[in-house]
């Protein structure tokens, strides 16, 4: 970030040389870069995984700049909050769905999952899918997910919450209801303040609240 001559803050996005940063590429058991395959509606986005050691904590980062992806999808992670609402949705699918898939590939399983802001809300879609795949009903799965989920709201004003039109949301999330054991309308209603209101968009924050036992704000 820099300041202009009149004191305005300017955000600059520069290409990073990962070889000069305190960051390590995560490798698989064969010594190859670990790749997480994240399903969208009818195709996959392939993400590399990087690890940053923050004290005693490992921070894992997803990177779609992978030659297996289309040029459009390679840019998903180029810039935080960059692009249009479609790219924002693809980022949030990567963070939520891809985040849980990454933990599974790394063999990491925790008792509590903390959704820190609505951008990661879709973690609970994947968690429900996983429980249903194990043989649980949707009702059983969502109760387990709720009991082990905490959601933190950082921006408790209308402008701080992401809303997605049903058409756009369905373009990438249309395959998930069947895996969750519910209908498309059921999934949409989990993200609506007024379930059944067809004119209401899907809100990540509402979805996070509806799938978490505890909700707090900072």
Predicted regions and their residues:
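Catalytic cores of carbohydrate-active enzymes across secretory and cytosolic contexts
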Residues: 1-218
């Amino acid at each position: 970030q820099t300041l202009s001559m009149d004191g305005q803050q300017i955000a600059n996005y520069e290409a990073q040389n990962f070889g000069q940063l305190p960051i390590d590429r995560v490798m698989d058991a064969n010594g190859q870069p670990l790749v997480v395959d994240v399903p969208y509606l009818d195709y996959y986005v392939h993400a590399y995984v990087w690890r940053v050691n923050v004290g005693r904590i490992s921070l894992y980062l997803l990177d779609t700049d992978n030659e297996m992806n289309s040029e459009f999808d390679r840019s998903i992670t180029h810039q935080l909050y960059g692009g249009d609402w479609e790219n924002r949705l693809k980022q949030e699918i990567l963070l939520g769905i891809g985040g849980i898939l990454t933990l599974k590939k790394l063999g990491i399983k925790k008792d509590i999952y903390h959704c820190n802001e609505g951008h990661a809300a879709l973690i609970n879609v994947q968690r429900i899918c996983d429980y249903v795949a194990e043989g649980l009903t949707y009702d059983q799965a969502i109760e387990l997910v709720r009991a082990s989920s905490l959601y933190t709201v950082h921006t408790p004003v209308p402008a701080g919450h992401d809303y997605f039109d049903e058409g756009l949301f369905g373009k990438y999330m249309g395959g998930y209801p069947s895996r969750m054991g519910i209908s498309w309308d059921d999934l949409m209603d989990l993200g609506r303040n007024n379930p059944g209101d067809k004119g209401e968009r899907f809100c990540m924050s509402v979805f996070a609240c509806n799938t978490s036992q505890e909700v707090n704000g900072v």
